[in-house]
Amino acid sequence: MKLTCMMIAAVLFLTTWTFVTADDSRYGLKNLFPKARHEMKNPEASKLNKREGCSSGGTFCGIHPGLCCSEFCFLWCITFID
């Protein structure tokens, strides 16, 4: 019984926390879908395609692939040519 009450309280708390910390819980999904549709029509509009501060091929990256524009890192950034 205590476990059931604790589970219900935890679910209610997490649900409330999600709505409180959301940017716009009232119109969040309404504004999300038109933007996604616009980005599908124009893939250049996507912010995910832009990589700022990344290293080009041949520069030292250690073991962190996030530093390379190509996302391939083996001590140096690797760029594949098609």
UniProtKB/Swiss-Prot annotation:
First and last residue of the signal peptide: 1-22
Gene Ontology terms: cellular component: extracellular region; host cell presynaptic membrane
UniProt keywords, alphabetically: Calcium channel impairing toxin, Cleavage on pair of basic residues, Disulfide bond, Ion channel impairing toxin, Knottin, Neurotoxin, Presynaptic neurotoxin, Secreted, Signal, Toxin, Voltage-gated calcium channel impairing toxin
Residue ranges the record assigns to the propeptide: 23-51
The keyword Disulfide bond belongs to this UniProt entry's keyword annotation: yes
GO molecular-function terms, A-Z: calcium channel regulator activity; sodium channel inhibitor activity; toxin activity
Tissues of expression: Expressed by the venom duct.
Subcellular location: Secreted
Pfam families per UniProt: Conotoxin (PF02950)
Disulfide bridge partners, by residue number: 54-69, 61-73, 68-77
Family: Belongs to the conotoxin O1 superfamily.
Job of this protein: Omega-conotoxins act at presynaptic membranes, they bind and block voltage-gated calcium channels (Cav).
Domain notes: The presence of a 'disulfide through disulfide knot' structurally defines this protein as a knottin.
Protein's recorded name: Omega-conotoxin-like 9
Protein source organism: Conus striatus (Striated cone)
